[in-house]
Amino acid sequence: MALVRWGLKRQNFHPLRRRRRALLLKLTVVIISVLLFCEYFIYYLVLFRCHWPEVKTLAHGGRQEPVLKAMFLADTHLLGEIRGHWLDKLRREWQMERAFQTALWLLQPEVVFILGDIFDEGKWSSDQAWADDVQRFQRMFRHDSHVQLKVVIGNHDVGFHYQMSKYRIKRFEKVFGSERLLSLKGVNFVMVNSVAMEGDGCIICSEEEAELREISRKLNCSQEVPGSSQCDREPEPRLPLSAPVLLQHYPLYRASDANCSGEDAAPPEERNVPFEEKYDVLSREASQKLLWWLRPRLVLSGHTHSACEVLHPGGAPEVSVPSFSWRNRNNPSFIMGSLTSRDYALSKCYLPFEDTVLTMYGAAAGFLMILILVHFEHLPSPFLCGWKLCRLHMRR
């Protein structure tokens, strides 16, 4: 009898072990599938819908005018060692890395501009912390040699005006370069250190304004007929005949975001809050200087973390680019630009929404709970009967 009982127990034990293994396999498959989709494949699914805008091209000498494909993003705010929790770093930096690498692979831009505040603590970080942040940035925003990556100075990178120092600016420029003027495929870009546009005559501010006046002179020379002025005596070749695209961190002066609209504009309760000059936006005087000196055909800026489109006096349009990070908004995005020397077209590309990903994780957690409860038959009888009927129907 003892042998018979032992045999029956052993027979009952094997099906139980098989059921546990089946449950473990189901849970593993669901968890891995959800992780792969939410942390990897969703970026391809969402960014696959983005396309380069069409721009009118003119023929010169029997050849079509070249089109430059440029990406513009802003305010990545990589967290530092002081305010950055490790889980916050891991989550938000992985999101930006996957979004950027997917965009490079799918869209293949020729140049990428980041409009300031790439770091969150550059204004007070030590040299070692700065080196660590730079290393993380270079890993996240790695790119092939045929893609150019240009970065504009932001207030979190070197500090607000009264925190800014020559040392911090040199530290930034040592990594990201100091060029203010860039010409690609006949398109002129002017990258401004808008933190230095305080207008109080400080040494850094005076040097920045002097450099911008020199750029203004070069742009004016490009519009003159060769042989008709002193510009011909310049040792450097002339710039392409093209009104520049102005890139900076602070927006040009505007009273508020009251006239901004769209799903990624500032929340309605914040749009009528007046902006503070030299903190939220550039001062009126600094804005007028930039528009007068450079006469841009397009201005792109960051800083506010929200989208806005403004038409400035003289007809210069400005586009404020929203933050690229989930840390600053639920629906981050970037701008795609197709540019020629005479024309341009812009479109916006949204990244996966953070609440969508969190909802998917919540739904997956609920499904896992149901699997576990069904396995141990802890569901109320109506749910259990319904589950068994579904399984029976699926087998047929």
From Swiss-Prot:
Its EC number is 3.1.-.-. One of its GO terms (biological process) is GPI anchor biosynthetic process. GO terms for molecular function: GPI-mannose ethanolamine phosphate phosphodiesterase activity; manganese ion binding. Binds 2 manganese ions per subunit. It comes from the Eukaryota. It is found in: Endoplasmic reticulum-Golgi intermediate compartment membrane. A divalent metal cation 2 binds at residues 75, 117, 249, 305. Signal peptide: none annotated. A divalent metal cation 1 binds at residues 117, 155, 249, 303. Gene3D superfamilies: 3.60.21.10. Its cofactor is Mn(2+). GO terms for cellular component: endoplasmic reticulum exit site; endoplasmic reticulum-Golgi intermediate compartment membrane; Golgi apparatus; nucleoplasm. The keyword Manganese applies. The keyword Hydrolase applies. InterPro entries: Calcineurin-like_PHP_ApaH, Metallo-depent_PP-like, MPP_MPPE1, PGAP5/Cdc1/Ted1. The chain crosses the membrane at residues 28-48, 356-376. Its main location: endoplasmic reticulum. SUPFAM superfamilies: Metallo-dependent phosphatases. Belongs to the metallophosphoesterase superfamily. MPPE1 family. Metallophosphoesterase that catalyzes the removal of a side-chain ethanolamine-phosphate (EtNP) from the second mannose of the GPI-anchor protein intermediate. Participates in the glycan remodeling steps of GPI-anchor maturation to allow an efficient transport of GPI-anchor proteins from the endoplasmic reticulum to the Golgi. PANTHER family: METALLO PHOSPHOESTERASE RELATED (PTHR13315), METALLOPHOSPHOESTERASE 1 (PTHR13315:SF0). This is Metallophosphoesterase 1. It comes from Mus musculus. The lineage of its organism: Eukaryota, Metazoa, Chordata, Craniata, Vertebrata.
